[in-house]
Swiss-Prot record:
Keyword presence, Translocase: no
Family: Belongs to the paramyxoviruses nucleocapsid family.
Residues covered by region (Homomultimerization): 440-461
Name by which UniProt lists this protein: Nucleoprotein
Organism name: Human parainfluenza 1 virus (strain C39) (HPIV-1)
Chain segments carrying region Ncore: 4-404
Keywords, alphabetical: Capsid protein, Helical capsid protein, Host cytoplasm, Ribonucleoprotein, RNA-binding, Viral nucleoprotein, Virion
Region feature Ntail, mapped onto this chain: 405-524
GO terms of molecular function: RNA binding; structural molecule activity
Length: 524
């Protein structure tokens, strides 16, 4: 039997291995599109010209009349301006199964009076039509930078801070967009400006060069549609040699942004390991957590097999990235989130009210995290030489710290979960009131939250979803009206009862209505 169980324990990891392994056979290349990339030739030496070209690339990348592949090519051209050898940058990081980059040079021609004196060319020929298309008149539907709304002088910024700082401010913001563009498009604009604040405070990005919200959304849309652009940026982070002592300021800033990009979309997976497994509490021995633990173990093996690109599994849309979703290990994730909201206050803002949340495991995680004995690591006791007296004092302090907070945290961010908690315990029948009293229900919302079973029926996600569908504004209005009528009737009956001198306390209790209890519970 032991051998049979061990076979099942390793099944998840072996199954994942078999899915990821190649079945052999010939490798058949897919279709690749051609993307034009423009780089600065040696004749373009003036800093004002360079900044003009950079803003031209940015403007073209936001032009909704162009194909997304063309817009992506302009963003690649902009990113390549950070390096002294754009060709080497693209050769090193731009190898991609989806696209083939065709490089064109932009040169300065003193004889030309149109197109700002620029010409697009290769070694063999010049491209007049491409030059006019690139440097011809453009209608910017929206300003690129917030400073343009205030008529800020970019040339003055260039003279004050220099070309590298101005170019770096633009490129860093493109990198910041990637942090949320793929994994959280709905929160892109807010996330962008939150991440940008640190770079504004240290002077990396000047206020006049801050992207507008429309610019951020436009770049994000291109990134979501052009996986080749995202792959290029990820390869830049993977191949960037962090041990170099001669990193430019822009490269250092790219690495800082890269720390936010790494493991983007894997927060649930990492938090489950951090709060669910690494805390090493006794709850991990529960049998209903074992399947999820085995699943998590197989995911760890998959993650490690990806090597340097493992942190970018989601942002690269790796075929296995869906396996890391918490819905594949819901019980363990729910338990870990319960531990997290107790141990880390910042995690109380994390969206836990999801359809696959296991309420029992979520509450169990909070319970064990609040328990003083569970907070003491037996593995470290021997290593640190902690005495029994010291352990008792530590338990005493932990109990005092957590003793005043007996409330359990509710899930956040999930409409179905919130509705289930807020409305399922609204009852108006006398039999329901008696049933509630028999089960020692209380009007205190915190105590009621700890005892989350109602009528011997634990709140389920499916029931919550049905309740959310059935509950509307008219239902809530009806409930409010019923409560108002009940309160009025109760007030009248209490007034009549006070006039009866021979009324007993038991009779008063029988006349007591449950509307007040329902209102006190917080059902509305």
């Amino acid at each position: 039997m032991a051998g049979l169980l061990s076979t099942f324990d390793t099944f998840s990891s072996r199954r994942s291995e078999s899915i990821n392994k190649s079945g052999g056979g010939a490798i058949i290349p897919g279709q690749r599109s051609t993307v034009s990339v423009f780089i600065l030739g040696p004749s373009v030496t003036d800093d004002a010209d360079k900044l003009l070209i950079a803003t031209t690339f940015l403007a073209h990348s936001l032009d909704t009349d162009k194909q997304h592949s063309q817009r992506g090519g302009f963003l690649v051209s902009l990113l390549a301006m950070a390096y002294s050898s754009p060709e080497l940058y693209l050769t090193t990081n731009g190898v991609n199964a989806d696209v083939k980059y065709v490089i064109y040079n932009i040169e300065r021609d003193p004889k030309r009076t149109k197109t700002d004196g620029f010409i697009v060319k290769t070694r063999d020929m010049e491209y007049e039509r491409t030059t006019e298309w690139l440097f011809g008149p453009m209608i910017n539907k929206n300003p690129l930078f917030q400073g343009q709304r205030e008529n800020a002088d970019l040339e003055a910024l260039l003279q004050t801070y220099g070309y590298p700082a101005c170019l770096g401010a633009i490129i860093v913001q493109v990198w910041i967009v990637l942090v949320k563009a793929i994994t959280s498009s709905s929160g892109l604009r807010k996330g962008f400006f939150n991440r940008l604040e640190a770079f504004r405070q240290d002077g990396t990005v000047k206020s006049a060069l801050v992207f507008t919200g429309d610019t951020v959304e436009g770049i994000g849309a291109v990134m979501r549609s052009q996986q080749s652009l995202v792959s290029l940026m990820v390869e830049t982070l993977v191949t960037m040699n962090t041990s170099r002592s001669d990193l430019t300021t822009l490269e250092k800033n790219i690495q800082i942004v890269g720390n936010y990009i790494r493991e983007s979309g894997l927060a649930s997976f990492m938090n489950t390991i951090k709060y669910g497994v690494e805390t090493k509490m006794a709850a991990l021995t529960l049998s209903n957590l074992r399947p999820d633990i085995n699943k998590l173990r197989s995911l760890v093996d998959i993650y490690l097999s990806k090597g340097a690109r493992a942190p970018f599994t989601c942002i690269l849309r790796d075929p296995v990235h869906g396996e890391f979703a918490p819905g594949n290990y819901p019980a363990l994730w729910s338990y870990a989130m319960g531990v997290a909201v107790v141990q880390n206050k910042a995690m109380q803002q994390y969206v836990t009210g999801r359809t696959y949340l296991d309420m029992e495991m979520f509450l169990l995680g909070q319970a064990v995290a609040k328990d003083a004995d569970s907070k003491i690591s037996s593995a470290l006791e021997e290593e640190l030489g902690v005495t029994d007296t010291a352990k008792e004092r530590l338990r005493h302090h932990l109990t005092n710290l957590s003793g005043g907070d007996g409330a359990y945290h509710k899930p956040t961010g999930g409409g179905a979960i919130e509705v289930a908690i807020d409305h399922t315990d609204i009852t108006f029948g006398a039999e329901d009131t008696a049933d509630r009293d028999n089960k020692n229900w209380t009007n205190n919302s915190n105590e009621r939250w700890m005892n989350h079973s109602i009528n011997n029926h634990t709140i389920t996600i499916s029931g919550a979803e049905e309740l959310e569908e059935e509950t509307n504004d008219e239902d809530i209005t009806d409930i409010e009206n019923k409560i108002a009528r009940r309160l009025a009737d109760r007030k009248q009956r209490l007034s009549q009862a006070n006039n009866r001198q021979d009324a007993s306390s038991d009779a008063d209790h029988e006349n007591d209505d449950d509307a007040t209890a329902a209102a006190g519970i917080g059902g509305i």
